[in-house]
Regions:
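Hydrophobic/aromatic residues located in beta-strands of well-ordered beta-sheets
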Residues: 116, 180-182
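Short catalytic micro-motifs in class I SAM-dependent methyltransferases
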Residues: 154-161, 183
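Feature marks short, surface-exposed loop/turn motifs that line or immediately flank catalytic pockets
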Residues: 125, 188-190, 236-239
Length: 292
């Protein structure tokens, strides 16, 4: 199996001589070292992968929505944001959500698409979606060549030890000229790069996240997979209240506390725009085209 470092090296986003230890351990494992490429800024874990079984069983998730039936606030909020932001690529289109989780995005847009399906490893999620009338497969191999207008994948790519073959499979199922929308966490997150918030660093580094990309490394990866017309934009998932709580109390959840009263639409949009100016959003989104 190719390691994520080998892939990063192949695309010119990491070199052995530029490797430095970023953290001795992650939030869930003391035996996993996290590295940073001092030249590119990419953050990565080399030589570790928990295995597909972890994702099939779903034990790594902090909440199992298929069992609890609850609607996690962050997941619901993300689904709403994505449905609005990516509507031009979804409305009236045939789409697949690769790594769809409990299907929050698919459920949100199902009345707007021409057809839709999900791909997900976690077995109970697959069963629940199929039971609810949303087609869900465990592999892209179930989908025909050139059959879809749009492929979306939200916070999945960073989990993959070999992302290039997966991106190639996404290209295979897309029609010529089809669109891929890829969302990943950002190595230049304001709390990490600019504020050096150790509490947040200890929380956000996770053995399941094998890489935190920069704009450049994400663009290189998609280009290496054969995509073209690649546009990268920054998105801020967590608002000012969240950052204030990390800085004042060294804990997550500020966006669900009394401080959330600060997060008016105007302030939230302005904060995201300000972070974009310095390339410090917590999330990157790539929108890319499959060659015609």
């Amino acid at each position: 199996m190719t390691t994520i470092f080998e892939t990063l090296h192949e695309i010119g986003a990491a070199r052995e001589e530029d490797r430095e230890v970023y953290s001795e351990g992650t939030r869930d494992r003391d035996d996993v070292t996290v590295y940073r490429d001092r030249r590119s800024g990419v953050i990565y874990i080399d030589g570790f992968y928990g295995g597909d079984e972890v994702y099939e069983e779903g034990g790594y998730r902090e909440k199992n929505l298929a069992k609890s039936g609850s609607r996690d606030y962050e997941i619901a909020r993300d689904a709403e944001r994505r449905a609005t932001a990516y509507r031009p690529f979804v409305c009236g289109r045939t789409i697949v959500d690769f790594g769809c989780g409990d299907g929050s995005f698919l459920r949100k847009v199902q009345d707007e698409t021409l057809s839709l399906c999900g791909v997900e490893l976690q077995r109970d999620y697959v069963e629940a979606l199929n039971r609810d009338g949303i087609r869900c497969h465990t592999s892209l191999e179930a989908l025909e060549n050139g059959s879809l207008d749009t492929a979306v994948s939200f916070h999945v790519l960073e989990h993959l030890p070999e992302p290039l073959p997966v991106l190639g499979a996404l290209r295979r199922v897309l029609k010529p000229g089809g669109t891929a929308v890829i969302e990943v966490p950002h190595a230049n997150d304001f709390l990490l790069r600019d504020l050096s918030c150790e509490a947040f660093k200890g929380f956000t580094l996770w053995s399941q996240h094998l890489v935190l990309h920069t704009r450049d490394s994400l663009r290189r990866l998609l280009a290496a997979a054969g995509f073209e017309a690649i546009a990268i934009e920054g998105v801020q998932r967590y608002p000012l209240s969240n950052h204030l709580t990390w800085l004042s109390s060294a804990r997550p959840g500020g966006h669900k506390s009394a401080l959330a009263a600060l997060d008016t639409a105007d302030l939230t949009n302005a904060y995201e725009a300000a972070l974009n100016r310095i390339d410090a959003t917590d999330t990157l989104v790539a929108i890319a085209r499959n060659p015609a």
